[in-house]
Amino acid sequence: MHVTLPDGKQLDLQAGATALDVARALGPRLAQDALAALVNGELMDLMTPLPEGAQVRLITKKNPGDAAPVFRHSLGHVLSQAVGEFYQRKGYPREAVKRGVGPAIENGFYQDFDLPEPLKEEDLPEIEAIMREIIGRGLDIVRQDVGKAAALKHFSYDPYKVELIQELPENEPVTFYAQGDYVDLCRGPHFPNTGKLPGAFKLMSTSGAYWRGNEKNPILQRVYGVAFATQKELDEYLERLEEARRRDHRKLGRELELFLIDPLVGKGLPMWLPNGTVLREELTRFLREQQFQRDYQGVVTPNIGNLDLFRTSGHYPYYSDSQFEPLSVDEEQYMLKPMNCPFHIRIYASKPRSYRDLPVRLAEFGTVYRYEMSGELNGLTRVRGFTQDDAHIFARPDQLKKEFLDVLDLTVLVLKTFGMNDVRFRVGVRDPASDKYVGDPAQWEVAERQIIEAVEEVGLPYTVEPGDAAFYGPKLDFVVKDVLGREWQLGTIQVDYNLPERFDLTYTGEDGQEHRPVMIHRAPFGSLERFVGILIEHYGGDFPFWLAPRQIMLIPIADRHNAYAQTLANEFKAAGLRAEVDDSNNRMNAKVRNAELHKIPVMLIVGDQEEARREVSVRERTPEGHKERKGVDFTALLAELQERYRTRA
């Protein structure tokens, strides 16, 4: 067999040769330094036989980061071995520790266990120390191919491995990887030796996880770790993680009294507290203003609908796994609304439409319900009941590009208004090899071309992702990077040829004939809950003045200044601003500290001098730090803050 190197050179090797054989053919030093290989663009370990004609690039200790998924996978095996040794040192037999799966994941690895007694967080440092012992032993990591019967016999004590092995094809070898006396069922890839694994790793946490993600299965204990090629990368990651903890929307949501999730109300069903309600209403007011300027029409639809509506749309039964069970009322079946679009379609269809009427733009802040497994729920970002800023545009095919551009412009405006300036687009188009798509291929080609043209006109970076389109039409996802460098998919625009067909939507064309409209789904926020959760973390709770639930805190120096402070607060309120007075018995410094803890952007201190001159002393929270101004005329400040609120500066 032969393989091709990055410089185009070809090597002739024996059949069944591995990447390690390639390294040996190029020299003993390279064989010593090699860690993994990129084979036909995919990561592979040094022990796996190469395919004929493969293109091979060796990864060495000079660039270990290129093999991060491989060393993270191997560290997962080291973790698994270390947990086994941890329990053996406690007197348990080797077979007492049973194992689920343990893949490499972004930034690290995890391993699932069925343990004789639960691991505690305080056990993790000891297990990490055992991992470092195993790395220090310099154990060769060896690939082994065995028959299915032998594999079942080896793991007869472990029901999880037995289940996985039984699902494998009968006549194919089962792959094990061994290091020392530890053996695991695994396809690889792995580093060649534990001694070559980086020491820049850390065990982070332990939690419960259902076997194979199914709530009907046993709960296993999952241990998470992170790993990087260098200590510098690990330290930087841990710093970012600490900053993320400080910004965690669940923590800040409690501290700033924004939302509440009460177990008696139900998991994944957030309630908005007064401060959070202000935040939510500012978001909806902003978007309603933008939609009004773009000729959207507001609608309101029920929270439940007849099951036949969702049968017609196809949401039931095709998406029934992510929906709540139907309920029976008066011999009819109803379902909690999983999506707003079928309701908007029925509004469109409620009267005849002419080509002159189109486009019809229907918008709603509509609450929908999706069944999420309890293990996937997370604060506001993964919930069971949420409100979408949903709109559906019914347009003629010749209007598609213009409407798409307008929605694109609106969504970019929304994101940039909230300081999310690092935006890229992901255009989802058909996979030419798939037959899952509905609609006329010629229409698809026009729609895909017009979406790409629209994106290019905006001038932001984009990628085209074949196969990422929905079955009913191409789509555009907005991917935003926040201040922590994390990427979020916020907002989607989807072109839909399917639902107009299913509901037999028409309009009368200029030729007097009935024609099928094209439909656009759009939601710039996606959902208010998720968007607010991301906003809280993006701003770290330090919202801009116009968005802050509590905008102004007046701080009297002494009790005799309370009346003056209240007079000013009333004038702020009359001007539409949110102001309050801290008339507690605390000292002034304590009042300032309390306002700081609640991240109130504007603090106004008033004493004898300020009252005599109708002035205030201003202390502001800004992204650059605190900004202080003494003796500011109140009337001028009121006008300044009104303008900031009006312009959302």
From Swiss-Prot:
Provide the alphabetized UniProt keywords. Aminoacyl-tRNA synthetase, ATP-binding, Cytoplasm, Ligase, Metal-binding, Nucleotide-binding, Protein biosynthesis, RNA-binding, tRNA-binding, Zinc
List of residues binding Zn(2+): 341, 392, 521
Give the top-rank taxon of the lineage listed in the UniProt record for this protein.
Answer: Bacteria
Say which species the protein is native to: Deinococcus geothermalis (strain DSM 11300 / CIP 105573 / AG-3a)
Catalytic activity reads:
tRNA(Thr) + L-threonine + ATP = L-threonyl-tRNA(Thr) + AMP + diphosphate + H(+)
Q: Name one GO molecular function term.
A: metal ion binding
Q: Which Pfam families match?
A: HGTP_anticodon, TGS, tRNA-synt_2b, tRNA_SAD
Traced from the root, the source organism's taxonomic lineage reads:
Bacteria, Thermotogati, Deinococcota, Deinococci, Deinococcales
Q: Which cofactor does it need?
A: Zn(2+)
- The coding gene here is thrS
By what name is this protein known? Threonine--tRNA ligase
Region called Catalytic, residue ranges:
248-544
Where would you find this protein in the cell?
A: Cytoplasm
HAMAP family, alphabetized = Thr_tRNA_synth (MF_00184)
